[in-house]
Amino acid sequence: MRMSKLYKNKEKENEKPSNEPPIKQDSLKRMSSKFLGNSLNSFDLSGKLEQVDEYLKKYPFIIEFGYKLGIKPSYIVVFGGSALFISLVLGWGAALICNLVGFAYPAYQSFKAVESQGHAETKLWLTYWVVFSLFFFIEYLIDIILFWIPFYYVIKLLFLLYLYMPQVRGAETVYNYIIRPILLKHEKTIDDTVHKISQTATNHLNQFTGNIAEKLVQEGVRRRNV
């Protein structure tokens, strides 16, 4: 009996209301809406789009294209970027997009650098092609593994842009800190190997062409005698 009374008294003590006032649902809603409003105000979407429109004035063809469609140029960039991202994620023409970014644009810029005879720009694009060639070779060797990496084409596109974007010039960083030290260390070995291979190939080619020429001469002599 005493134990049951003690147990009941403890239950009553636990059931006593606490002195702390409960948080009302209305106050929670106001707090959440205030937080959301502050977040949206801190990220001024219209202001960001206006900045994009201002930047796109450097590219008249985008301005003209937007004027024909009846929309702001920033919308074209947003829609185009979204479509590009979806294509890369789903693999729709992802290889073509990466080839355009990795081959076509750098090739045209290399042409402009050569024609302008600008030493700095020519060096930049030569550096890019050295890094890109190594990247292409490694990609070819481990293509089966790369197939299973999620969002690989997105990563590849960002890496290619990183290599030649003027704001970062990533190709120079990769070349100076990774490729250049390795090539300088093994330059003599590489040169000797290339020289031996080219000399061997030249000897085999000369021997092959010599055998063909000899057979042609013998065939000509045989036909004359007939």
From Swiss-Prot:
Effect of disrupting the coding gene: During the asexual blood stage, parasites have a slower growth, a delayed ring-to-trophozoite transition and display abnormal endoplasmic reticulum architecture and an enlarged digestive vacuole. In infected mice, the number of male and female gametes is reduced, resulting in a severe decrease in the number of midgut oocytes and salivary gland sporozoites in the mosquito. Sporozoites have a slight reduction in motility and the invasion of host hepatocytes is slightly delayed. In C57BL/6 mice, parasitemia is reduced and the parasite fails to induce experimental cerebral malaria (ECM).
Concerning InterPro entries, the annotation shows: TB2_DP1_HVA22 (IPR004345)
Region ranges (Disordered): 1-25
Q: How does it sit in the membrane?
A: Multi-pass membrane protein
Stretches of Basic and acidic residues bias are at 8-18
Upon changing residue 49 to D, the result is: Does not affect membrane tubule formation
According to its UniProt record, where is this protein located?
Endoplasmic reticulum membrane
The membrane spanning regions, by residue number, are 73-92, 95-113, 124-140, 144-162
Which residues point to the Cytoplasmic side?
A: 1-72, 114-123, 163-226
A Pfam family annotated for this chain is: TB2_DP1_HVA22
Q: Which UniProt keywords apply?
A: Endoplasmic reticulum, Membrane, Transmembrane, Transmembrane helix
What role does it play? Required to generate and maintain the structure of the tubular endoplasmic reticulum network and the digestive (food) vacuole. Induces high curvature in membranes and causes membrane tubule formation.
Name of the molecule in the record: Protein YOP1 homolog
**Which gene is this protein's source?**
YOP1
